[in-house]
């Protein structure tokens, strides 16, 4: 069995003074994430910037899909909140709370919202994920003042001229924030492979669709082109966010085309 970040292990101490030992056993896992590769995770916190770089919502929706597929709750955190007005932030909050995620706005640069982040993290093991350049490393350094004692300080990277972040976290690493509270910091990503979900099952991982299951004209409606679809009607009525539905249809087509080859 291959060790993963977040594993609980049994060790054989070989140098007590210098805290050195060998792993002799990996204890049973309560869960195992494919990506980010980790184990014993309570929740995921995905971090995007509200601007600079502009958020890729399709990428965010894919991440939420991946976590739903792996039965891991997701907290959506938007950094650089000072760059957006209240109307835009309220739209984002409504959009992502509508799909079952807690939505938090922070400014790592100005130390705003960090107390709320600590409340959400407390007593849990949380995977931190997000694209490069969104301020994830800056946030990690704020959450763990003694990071240098635990390992390397996360280097922060500026956003490049083309608006994409530069990777700063090179590998996944787990840190102790406070008592019984851990974060698993992961490298930034610019793309995500879809989980191994069938297109017929995709709808079950979009939580805002769940109240409309069984209300469509046809059993097994996939909410794409079928007439009498309750989900499409909910989109027209403004009950389901249009952009989230568009992400669903885009991912549906991606899965369908992937299965052809």
What annotation goes with each model-predicted range?
Residues 45-46, 127:
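Conserved beta-strand elements of the Class I
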Residues 2-17, 27-44, 50, 66, ...:
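Helix-rich effector regions associated with P-loop NTPase G domains
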Residues 83-134:
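Canonical P-loop GTPase G-domain recognition
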Residues 132, 137-138, 142:
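Walker A/P-loop
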Residues 58-68:
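Histidine-anchored nucleotide/phosphate-binding helix
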Residues 53, 136, 191:
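Short glycine-rich, flexible loops that bind phosphorylated cofactors or substrates
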Residues 48-57:
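Short, glycine-rich nucleotide/cofactor-binding loops
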Residues 56-59, 88-89:
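Residues at alpha-helix caps and immediate loop-helix transition turns in enzyme cores, especially N-
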